[in-house]
Every structure is written in structure tokens, then in C-alpha cells.
Amino acid sequence: MDRTRIVRRWRRNMDVADDAEYVEMLATLSEGSVRRNFNPYTDIDWESPEFAVTDNDPRWILPATDPLGRHPWYQAQSRERQIEIGMWRQANVAKVGLHFESILIRGLMNYTFWMPNGSPEYRYCLHESVEECNHTMMFQEMVNRVGADVPGLPRRLRWVSPLVPLVAGPLPVAFFIGVLAGEEPIDHTQKNVLREGKSLHPIMERVMSIHVAEEARHISFAHEYLRKRLPRLTRMQRFWISLYFPLTMRSLCNAIVVPPKAFWEEFDIPREVKKELFFGSPESRKWLCDMFADARMLAHDTGLMNPIARLVWRLCKIDGKPSRYRSEPQRQHLAAAPAA
């Protein structure tokens, strides 16, 4: 009997037709995907001379918004070394994005498999999957052009990646929190780089611009999905989710933002530099906290910021003020970056 009740509740949560505002939001996102979408091989002229990847191109030097780019150790390296490190770093960020979005696509396919006929979520999830497939091709093409043999996600996460999408069917709330935990750090980092206005290599600038433009819809959907589903959970479920939320944010952030072991060995970067960068210095801790201002806003708005959850956010070192609105620029951080 209990199992039947759980299945009925699960199926009822899949039906969203009774929420006109939510359905309208899904229609808006779906129409946005139709009207404004990108193809990695028609919207990026990979063969253009200006897109050529050449040695000693200073546009690959890491910007000040990157924690390594503003560190004295990096700035003390020769220009050639800075370029080499920058190319490897940016290629690995693209590979990490590729790996994460591959997991996301598989999860969305598992989630939509169980959707009832007529669900407006089905259409939008498929639009998002198509866009993410294009992103993975775009990221891989960038890695190929740069020429660095980068690993992407840490090995342990690559090994468990086939299991993660299986969560999307029975535990979609947990899955979409994981989606945000992966999307928010990448989106935050890329927006800061574009806002800084530094001269970037055209490949990197175009790839980032396309990704940020389409990722805005994906993050909006994940936020609205959770705003709709979280109130339907039982009190005990919301409590456990409130603890899972910050733990997932921090653990996936580490996997996505911190370069893999191969990076530190390849360039013989001192251990104390790594410690300062991730996240031993006050500046790096602020950068970490800033990434999750939108996530904290969502936790506040959905009642997940209870006293114990606040403690977990603090222990994870990602506590702080929530955003006033989504994608609010962290102006103090941006202002300080060029001076670093």
C-alpha cells in the first residue's frame, strides 16, 4: 500500500497541466529555443583565419577574473608559459563542461521517458537536450583546436558518471539540484570573463557567448522546476533536501572549478599556490561564495534555509547574502579583479 501511494504521488508530480503560470513559462522557454538557437558548425566559422590557434597568442593569457590569472605566481611566469598554462586551463574547462552536459543529457532522457502524454515539460526538456548536444560538440571542437590532451572531470567522477543520470527518474528533485550545482559555477565564471572585457581568443569568446546565451534558459528552467516541486515534498523530505543542497553545490563545484591533478603536475605548480587558489585566501573564498548567490536565493525562497542548513552552507564555505535577482553581477568582485 505504501509503495502504491509513493508511485501515485510520483506520477502526480509529473503532471503540471493544472499550473497555468508554470505551463506558460515552459512555453516561453520552448519558443525561445526555437527562435534563438545556435549550431556549432554554422554559427562558428572554425576555418576562419581569425579563429586559428597559433603559438604565443597573448589572448590565451588567463584573465584577472580567473583565480589563477590574478595570482602572483602566474603573473611572474614568462609570457610563453602564461599562454601555455592558459590554453591548457581553458581547454580543460571546456572538457569539463562537455562531460557535465553529457551527464545532463542522459539524465533528461531518463526523466522524459516517464512523462505523461501532453506534458509541456517534455518539449522543453528535449529542446534543452538538443542545445546541450550542440554544446558538447562545440566544446570538443574547441579542445581539438587548442590541441591540449586534457582529462576534464576528475577520474572518480568519470567512472561514476553512468550512474548519475539514473537518479533523474525516481529522484528528479535531487537530480535538478545537481544540474544547478554544475551549471551555476560554469555560468558564473564565463559571465565574469565576458564582463571583464579583456581581449579573448575568438574561439573562446564565441564559445562562451553562445553557451551563456543558451544556458540562461536552462538555469531558469531548473530554478522554476525546483520552485514548483519543493513545496510538494513532505516536511522531512524538505529537511533532508535542505542539507543535500549545499553539500551537492560544494562537491560539484570542486569537481568543475578545481583543475585536475594532471594540471598541477604538467606545469609544476607549487602546492601552496594551489591551496591559496582553491580556496585558502580571502579573495578565493569570496569568489567561491559569489558563485552560489543565486542558489542561496533559491534556498531562501523555497524554505530550505533552516538553521541546520545554514550551518551546512557555512561549513561548506559557500554561505553569504543571496542574490536580489537571478544573475545579479557581483560588482565588488568585478571592480577588484583588474587591480589584482
Curated annotation (Swiss-Prot):
Membrane topology per record: Multi-pass membrane protein
Predominant place of localization: membrane
Protein name: Uncharacterized protein Mb0909
Domain of life: Bacteria
Subcellular localization(s) per the UniProt record: Cell membrane
GO MF annotations, alphabetized: oxidoreductase activity
Keywords: Cell membrane, Membrane, Transmembrane, Transmembrane helix
InterPro entries in the record: AurF/CmlI, Ferritin-like_SF, RNR-like
One Gene Ontology cellular component annotation held by this UniProt entry: plasma membrane
Parts of the chain that traverse the membrane: 162-182, 239-259
